[in-house]
């Protein structure tokens, strides 16, 4: 009887382990200058609390931005952001990874400004080998201008997962077997910027930036970077397979995370390129891996 019970417990444990996934590790908050440097219009960057908080300012003359000191192949990257409040129509606050060549890879968070009282739109996109056009858009389920919220990317050989706080909002699976290029051999820097894009950002460019409301300010803190640092010319991570994000529990979402993703898709998604039959005659191959399409 004891042997039978022990065998049963072993089977149950094996089944549970096969289904285990995990949330990314808790980010470590650090000062801005540990990982980042300004890229342009440094006079429009304001440092608060010894550089643990940074405010980007946009006016009619210029926006501004910053980038990481290093480039990375895979990892976990997050930022706490408080978006531009009030009438932010025409503005874009961006947090993204990008390589530096013509056939570039890129992983985007873009926050599209709104008229006062209208919800913010978060647009995500993935470029691989210079090909993008993979936009998805959601309405955020909270006011992102009232407090800081975490926006993060988990990028490994198996998937690119986008998170808002602890909620997954998008998963882009490695579909190399379907003939789809996947970002895996181009180190990327992280960037963030605040800029004017009133030719397209709000209602397709119909809503213009009201410069009487300037300056527009977006605030940042956290500055978490946990990645495999590599030169821009590197094609692989020297510790590939040994990092925490390479382990089996981080190769897919778990059941609870997929339920949260399904909730985002059902309640908050307003555009998904995978279902845009007017724009695309045939569904992109990688969309076959999207559970909610």
Curated annotation (Swiss-Prot):
UniProt keyword annotations, A-Z: Apoplast, Cell wall, Cell wall biogenesis/degradation, Disulfide bond, Glycoprotein, Glycosidase, Hydrolase, Secreted, Signal, Transferase
EC number: 2.4.1.207
GO biological process: cell wall biogenesis; cell wall organization; xyloglucan metabolic process
SUPFAM superfamilies reported for this sequence: Concanavalin A-like lectins/glucanases (SSF49899)
Cellular compartments per GO CC: apoplast
Signal peptide: 1-22
Domain GH16: 23-220
Gene3D superfamilies according to UniProt: 2.60.120.200
Active-site residues per Swiss-Prot or TrEMBL entry: 106 (nucleophile), 110 (proton donor)
Binding-site residues, xyloglucan: 110, 123-125, 133-135, 199-200, 204, 279
Superkingdom field: Eukaryota
Subcellular location as annotated: Secreted, Cell wall; Secreted, Extracellular space, Apoplast
Alphabetical list of InterPro entries matching this protein: Beta-glucanase/XTH, ConA-like_dom_sf, GH16, GH16_AS, XET_C, XTH
Glycosylation site list: 114
Modification after translation (UniProt): Contains at least one intrachain disulfide bond essential for its enzymatic activity.
Disulfide bridge map: 228-237, 274-287
Residues carrying the site annotation Important for catalytic activity: 108
Function recorded in the entry: Catalyzes xyloglucan endohydrolysis (XEH) and/or endotransglycosylation (XET). Cleaves and religates xyloglucan polymers, an essential constituent of the primary cell wall, and thereby participates in cell wall construction of growing tissues.
Family: Belongs to the glycosyl hydrolase 16 family. XTH group 1 subfamily.
Stated name of the protein: Probable xyloglucan endotransglucosylase/hydrolase
The organism of origin for this protein: Triticum aestivum
């Amino acid at each position: 009887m004891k042997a039978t019970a022990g065998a049963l417990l072993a089977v149950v444990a094996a089944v549970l382990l096969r289904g285990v996934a995990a949330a990314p590790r808790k980010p470590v908050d650090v000062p801005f200058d540990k990982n980042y440097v300004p890229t342009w219009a440094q006079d429009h960057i304001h440092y608060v609390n010894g550089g643990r908080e940074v405010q980007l300012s946009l006016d009619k003359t210029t926006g501004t931005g910053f980038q990481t000191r290093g480039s990375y192949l895979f990892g976990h990257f997050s930022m706490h952001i408080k978006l531009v409040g009030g009438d932010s129509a025409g503005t874009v606050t961006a947090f993204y990874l990008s390589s530096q060549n013509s056939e570039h890879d890129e992983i985007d968070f873009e926050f599209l400004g709104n008229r006062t009282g209208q919800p913010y739109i978060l647009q995500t996109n993935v470029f691989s080998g210079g090909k993008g056009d993979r936009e998805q858009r959601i309405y955020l389920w909270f006011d992102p201008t009232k407090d800081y919220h975490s926006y993060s990317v988990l990028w490994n050989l198996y998937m690119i997962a986008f998170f808002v706080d602890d909620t997954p909002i998008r998963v882009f699976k490695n579909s190399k077997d379907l003939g789809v290029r996947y970002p895996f051999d181009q180190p990327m820097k992280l960037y963030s910027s605040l800029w004017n894009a009133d030719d397209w950002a709000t209602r397709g460019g119909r809503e213009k930036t009201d410069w009487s409301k300037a300056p527009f300010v977006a605030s940042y803190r956290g500055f978490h970077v946990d990645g495999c640092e590599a030169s821009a010319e590197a094609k692989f991570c020297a510790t590939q397979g040994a990092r925490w994000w390479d382990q089996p529990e981080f190769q897919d979402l778990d059941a609870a995370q997929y339920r949260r993703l399904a909730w985002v898709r059902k309640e908050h998604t307003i555009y998904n390129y995978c279902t845009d039959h007017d724009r695309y005659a045939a569904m992109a191959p990688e969309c076959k891996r999207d559970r909610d399409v």
